[in-house]
Design a protein with these regions (language model features):
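Sec/Tat signal peptide C-region and signal peptidase I cleavage site
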Residues: 15-20
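Sec-dependent signal peptide recognition
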Residues: 2-10
Length: 337
């Protein structure tokens, strides 16, 4: 029991950090299924694949390395009204905290339905639901225990042993969201959504305690504003609340159509986002054919910049949207990220 003191302290620290570490991408707009379950299937195309990678605070023992991958598509198109969308999607998530001391993995599935509010499909409101199965695992080889520290230094050997239930944690989680999308002329676009996570308040404890996850609420919005015949401004904001923690991001990017082709554009994006009281995030993106690539870098502006050397972390996103086989198919009004 005496030797477990340092272990318990480490576990409590890891758990408290990890509960606040839901997927937290600076390019939130490039990770639709972690942003809002209602965005499942909400795109103009046949199917969509999205992948995200984030290495947060690399100078602090690789504090977090996060990866996600998702696939979603619209279904039953011949059985619902023309301007409605019924979406289904699947997602995987992996996060390593503390240089791999705590590993989190989940798999999820989502459903959404978007109801058109007018005959042109210019305005719609949608709802989505998501279920995930989470596994968290402690890698005790990455931890230091009391009996490894002696008057002669660090031994690297411990006599501590743990049952599987003490290093593995599993639970089911439920999320939901709503979103409104609209356009005034078929060229501009705007959206406003809200989502809630951990609706079932799952228990999360390695020592069979009664700690439950607090619900997390996010509010997001954005717009695409055409500039001239081919270019556009894109704005997006996201506000997240969980217990006493808050996270607010605002910013935008200018989209330059390099080839002056609206149907098959090659677009270059350049902009920046700001996470309040934390980081400035320059962003660069490239869209060509059915691919959209994004890269950003967090520059810490908070008190953490001394420990991180202002290096908040690099993030990369990749989205592939399969275009409809029929080039004359009606285009749907969807958020443009």
């Amino acid at each position: 029991m005496k030797k477990l003191l340092s272990t318990l302290i480490a576990c409590v620290a890891l758990i408290s950090v990890s509960t606040a570490q839901d997927p937290n991408f600076s390019q939130f707009f490039a990770s639709p299924m972690t942003l809002n379950p209602a965005l499942t299937g909400k795109f103009d195309g046949v199917y969509r694949f999205a992948a995200n990678y984030r290495n947060q605070w690399p100078t602090i023992s690789n504090a977090y390395t996060t990866m996600t991958a998702s696939f979603d598509m619209a279904i039953l198109k011949d059985r619902i009204p023309e301007n409605d969308q019924f979406g289904i999607g699947f997602m995987g998530y992996s996060d390593k905290a503390g240089d791999g001391a705590l590993n989190s993995t989940y798999f999820g599935a989502s459903l959404s339905y978007h109801k058109s509010l007018d005959e042109n499909g210019f305005h719609s409101i949608g709802a989505g639901f998501q279920g995930t199965y989470m596994n968290k695992r402690l890698n005790t080889s990455k931890l230091t225990f009391g009996d490894q520290l002696t008057p002669f230094g660090f031994t690297g050997v411990t006599q501590e042993s743990f049952a599987s239930s003490q290093v593995n944690l599993n639970y089911f989680d439920v999320n939901a969201g709503l979103i409104y999308t609209g356009t005034t002329n078929g060229y501009n676009n705007f959206y406003l959504g809200a989502s809630m996570y951990h609706l079932n308040r799952p228990k999360e404890s390695f020592n069979r305690g009664d700690y439950v996850l607090n619900m997390r609420t996010t509010i997001q919005g954005g717009a695409k504003i055409p500039v001239g015949s081919y270019n556009s401004f894109h704005f997006a904001a996201n506000h997240s609340m969980q217990a006493k923690a808050k996270n607010t991001m605002v910013g935008g990017a200018f989209c330059l159509n390099v080839n002056n082709d609206e149907e098959n554009p090659t677009n270059f994006y350049l902009g920046s986002w700001y996470r309040f009281q934390d980081a400035l995030i320059p962003y660069m993106g490239l869209e060509f054919g059915e691919w959209h690539f994004g890269a950003s870098y967090d520059v810490n502006t908070s008190s953490l910049k001394a420990a991180s050397n202002s290096r908040g972390g690099v993030e990369i996103s990749l989205i592939y949207i399969k275009k409809p086989v029929d080039p004359g198919a009606k285009k749907l009004n969807c958020p443009k990220f």
